[in-house]
Amino acid sequence: ATPYSPAHWTSTHPVDSTLAYLQYTSGSTSAPKGVMVSHGNMTAQSRCITEAGCYDADSVTLSWMPHFHDYGLVKGIVQPAWIGRPAYLMSPLTFLKRPLRWLEAIQRYHVTHSGAPNFAYRRCVETIAAEDRARLDLSGWQVASCGAEPIAHDTIDRFAEAFAPAGFRREAFFPAYGMAEYTLLISLKRESVAPTVLSLDPATLERGVVSEAKAGIAPVRQVVGCGAPVGDTRVVIAHPETLSRCAVQQVGEIWLAGASTTQGYWNNPEETARTFGATLRDTGEGPFLRTGDLGFVRDGEVFVTGRLKDLLIVRGRNHYPQDIERTVEQSHRLCRGGGAAAFSVQD
């Protein structure tokens, strides 16, 4: 028998609980962990994305996100195959070397769905010259998803303004929230309306209370909404220490339940139990997936304010590192966007 003969093939007959692949986390806040994604997780997630992602018979996708990342794998490869629509793939290096190529490909191949992290839209604004923008036609770009890192309101504003002459609509921005432990997508803006941006009082936000800033008050903390939970996803905001449900208009840890919840971490039962086995102390409901993200839900929409492990406490006050980083980046023209990192040190 040859290595390719039927004698060397064993049919697996996978069921929903069968392990499909290991998706390693980014390692941005801890050592990378292998997330166990099942076939059932994949099908549940694909149904969620299909329902929420505004796909139709004319949809065409394009992705330059790396395939080892859940964004590039699920949205770039699995989802187009699931819905049976054309998909174009571009190397991440192609985008990084010349961001214009991404937008040129969207025009050339009549792409309707393509997304990227916040930094990519910012790079397009910063590096694509006005004469190049004038040659683009982005009127067919229906869903410009944005996720995988904090979404800055000024990035949305600047990109929408810069590429409006090319036919890009602000309503095409679809902010999203997701994580590997939930296969990928947790929430996504649905309707063809502009993204929700709340102007919050930073003083009350430090205390974990959501309060819109009064007119004329400065500075304000602007938070971009990430849409409604997809499919059967249930979002609960819980106090990270008491493990009880937070009151309305209170910031807490985002907990999840749904068919996209993965099976845990490969060969790491202790961390699996900590992360995937949470129960609400006041009601006994569970199990929930603890995301480690801080946020709140308002009018059915998820808002992410930061990472629990990243929160900086200085003289008893809570500071979100992304706020400090953004302030530093905007303080001088020599400060490169995405080039600052705020963290605490022991005295």
Locate the predicted segments by residue:
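Gly/Ser/Thr-rich phosphate-binding loop
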Residues: V111-G115, V125-V220, R234-V236, E241-R245
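Conserved AMP-binding/adenylation subdomain of ANL enzymes
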Residues: T43-V60, H67-T112, T127-E131
